[in-house]
Swiss-Prot record:
Its EC number is 2.4.99.28. Pathway: Cell wall biogenesis; peptidoglycan biosynthesis. SUPFAM superfamilies: Lysozyme-like. This is Biosynthetic peptidoglycan transglycosylase. It is found in: Cell inner membrane. It is a single-pass membrane protein. The chain crosses the membrane at residues 15-35. InterPro entries: Glyco_trans_51, Lysozyme-like_dom_sf, PBP_transglycosylase, Pep_trsgly. Disulfide bonds: none annotated. NCBIfam families: mono_pep_trsgly. It is an enzyme of class 2 (transferase).
Length: 240
């Protein structure tokens, strides 16, 4: 008589191992995609970013008559005034840091812990670019961790000038307005290469809340903060 062979079924531990392996492979594939995309963008200009696509879709639902404004220009076609203003306002140590400002991250961590939720991120220019290129607006520690990984990739594969060039051409400056050239035409009827120091300072101050300042251009805070940034611009170090 032939003995019946029992087929063992995977137990819960084995299923957990399988699930962990699938998650790990998916995570590695995602990182490989990001890495490969950044490698390509070191030589090819990105036509859009994750933020631009999601933002323009949302705007198309709320304001279908709104036209998107975005024109890519080379790094040399952007006023040094604007470059200095943004560095003075957003990331004074941009040229010398490795994409992170540890003190700012720790300060943001303490504020977030006190609030019980993520309200600040302590982001450098490179971190902002990482977020705009690939990530959602969701605020979570998982997303922040992914942002730090992408930041490392950007700093590893690109020099500071290329990082700044992509940032300047993709950052949001109002409702449907992306990049320095579009912002210069939208607010001042000029090109990015001809922006004055005063105009550049105002544009730099708008960056954390571009939609708000698009609709509140007479804001007293905007005017006062722009004067502060204008005074700091002379000390801003550029990556060129």
């Amino acid at each position: 008589m032939t003995a019946t062979r029992r087929v063992s079924r995977p137990g819960p531990v084995r299923w957990m191992v399988y699930l962990g392996a699938v998650v790990a492979i998916a995570w590695l594939a995602t990182q490989a995609f990001y890495f490969g995309q950044i490698a390509v963008w070191n030589y090819v200009n990105p036509q859009s970013t994750s933020f631009m696509r999601s933002d323009t879709w949302r705007l198309s639902q709320d304001r279908p008559d709104l036209s998107v404004q975005h024109t890519w220009v080379s790094y040399d076609q952007i006023s040094r005034n604007l470059k200095r203003a943004i560095i003075a306002s957003e990331d004074a140590n941009f040229v010398n840091n490795n994409g992170y400002e540890t003190d700012a991250i720790l300060q943001a961590w303490e504020r977030n812990k006190a609030k019980g939720k993520i309200v600040r991120g302590g982001s450098t220019i490179t971190q902002q670019l990482a977020r705009n290129l690939f990530l959602s607006r969701e605020k979570s520690y998982i997303r922040k961790g992914q942002e730090l990984i992408i930041t490392w990739m950007l700093e590893t594969l690109m020099d500071k000038e290329r990082i700044f060039e992509i940032y300047l051409n993709s950052v949001e400056w109002g409702n449907g307005v992306y990049g320095a050239e579009a912002a210069a035409h939208y607010y001042y009827k000029t090109s990015a290469s001809k922006l004055t120091a005063a105009q550049s300072a105002r544009l730099a101050v708008m960056l954390p809340q571009p939609k708000y300042f698009d609709e509140h251009r007479g804001s007293q805070y905007l005017a006062q903060r722009a004067r502060v940034i204008a005074r700091r611009m002379g000390a801003a170090e550029l990556p060129d």
